Amino acid sequence: MGSSKSKPKDPSQRRRSLEPPDSTHHGGFPASQTPDETAAPDAHRNPSRSFGTVATEPKLFWGFNTSDTVTSPQRAGALAGGVTTFVALYDYESWTETDLSFKKGERLQIVNNTEGDWWLAHSLTTGQTGYIPSNYVAPSDSIQAEEWYFGKITRRESERLLLNPENPRGTFLVRKSETAKGAYCLSVSDFDNAKGPNVKHYKICKLYSGGFYITSRTQFGSLQQLVAYYSKHADGLCHRLTNVCPTSKPQTQGLAKDAWEIPRESLRLEAKLGQGCFGEVWMGTWNGTTRVAIKTLKPGTMSPEAFLQEAQVMKKLRHEKLVQLYAVVSEEPIYIVIEYMSKGSLLDFLKGEMGKYLRLPQLVDMAAQIASGMAYVERMNYVHRDLRAANILVGENLVCKVADFGLARLIEDNEYTARQGAKFPIKWTAPEAALYGRFTIKSDVWSFGILLTELTTKGRVPYPGMVNREVLDQVERAYRMPCPPECPESLHDLMCQCWRKDPEERPTFKYLQAQLLPACVLEVAE
């Protein structure tokens, strides 16, 4: 394996304290002015396709529509209206000779932005030219360039970020409103003895004249002025604004420009993370600079030609809840290079030390994240085929991402393709898929119901005490797993909806995502 050139880069957090302001209150909200706390479903922010429009024969990760892809965080702006000068949102250290290193705050002249996710840029600070990741920059003097602006993140995602125990009261961010077109929302961390840590959401309204306000008696010419004012005065907010919400650097879209089929020597395997029937997973580095996870497949697991064809499509699927495919070594033994998720598989995480401290609200949130990723798969008219906790990866702050999408179809092992062989995941597979090979997004919904039992039981194997053949027989006779201990009936009811015999009667992932709001699931448990 290639030798290491430098210390691997780990995603760093950015945190900025605002000037210690005068905390004097200047009045409160009028009687009609209250925080915007209307519950909004954690629906995906791109237009979704109703199930009725899905083709009758969905292709597995094929024929995608790139206009429905998502990158996260959504900060970089397009070159619109002649804007060519951008500002760096994060530090970036070049990974290849053609990359351009830059520091946060550096101004960059964009030379060419027509080649996808890596733009050719010229630094106005260093005078050097090279390729930069487009999601690391934003147009100069734009709202996207503000550290506190988080764009199109959901209410739930803002709460996940703000409720980090390290954040002091008054930590905040500004995001686009999910419910009011053209409006923004100010989300602020708070604490009180009754609720404990919580987040308040305030709608920022826009004036016809172009100004902004939270309460109409105090208006501002820009969002920047609004943030500066409330950093000094609570003036009706739960607390004055203190710290910008920290966030990690986003993943770049790919390892570098044109880094797709890479030489095996550019990868260094450093620590074995796991082993399965078809290969191993390693933590490693690419090019001596970049932390990655590497899946190594045993020779004969799948056709290199079929894998490469499928991987060309899979790499273009982008959603914040799907693990990103970075690069491949296409000659056997096949290597699959993906983004590194620090906490490993969800199954191991649930069964490990950290799993003991997970409570129902956190488990429901993890389920909602998985449903969000699968709702994207659903919209794109694809099928996962092997959805279970072992194929979900966990990162910092309990972030969950769906992995291994599409690979199950390519496996050539007889013990797997026989569908009832020792390696086939019978206990997670819908009966029509296990018995007749009918894999659809609805069979993925069945698997998601099984995954919910893994979450609520902290990684227990489904159908305890039953062997695979018995599971198939019992399920065909209408047996369904009972409600797990300490699981609310409302959540078990959602599982049972996923396990309806008729695939067309099972819910969509879009519906499941909306139902997995803590308030919907927890009211019975509490």
Swiss-Prot record:
Every SH3 domain range: 81-142
Molecular function as annotated in GO: ATP binding; metal ion binding; non-membrane spanning protein tyrosine kinase activity
Residue ranges, compositional bias (Basic and acidic residues): 7-25
Annotated stretches, region: Disordered: 1-52
Post-translational modification: The phosphorylated form is termed pp60v-src.
Protein name per Swiss-Prot or TrEMBL: Tyrosine-protein kinase transforming protein Src
EC number: 2.7.10.2
PANTHER family per record: TYROSINE-PROTEIN KINASE
Originating organism: Rous sarcoma virus (strain H-19)
Lipid-binding residues (covalent, N-myristoyl glycine): G2
Residues at which ATP binds: L273, G274, Q275, G276, C277, F278, G279, E280, V281, K295
Keyword Cell membrane: no
Coiled-coil regions listed: none
UniProt xrefs under Pfam families: PK_Tyr_Ser-Thr (PF07714), SH2 (PF00017), SH3_1 (PF00018)
Residue list for modification Phosphotyrosine: Y416
Family: Belongs to the protein kinase superfamily. Tyr protein kinase family. SRC subfamily.
Matches recorded under SUPFAM superfamilies: Protein kinase-like (PK-like), SH2 domain, SH3-domain
Cofactor dependency: Mn(2+)
Matches recorded under CDD domains: SH3_Src
Catalysed reactions, as listed in the record: L-tyrosyl-[protein] + ATP = O-phospho-L-tyrosyl-[protein] + ADP + H(+)
Keyword entries, A-Z: ATP-binding, Kinase, Lipoprotein, Manganese, Metal-binding, Myristate, Nucleotide-binding, Phosphoprotein, SH2 domain, SH3 domain, Transferase, Tyrosine-protein kinase
Active site: D386 (proton acceptor)
Residues of the Protein kinase domain: 267-517
Function summary: This phosphoprotein, required for both the initiation and the maintenance of neoplastic transformation, is a protein kinase that catalyzes the phosphorylation of tyrosine residues in vitro.
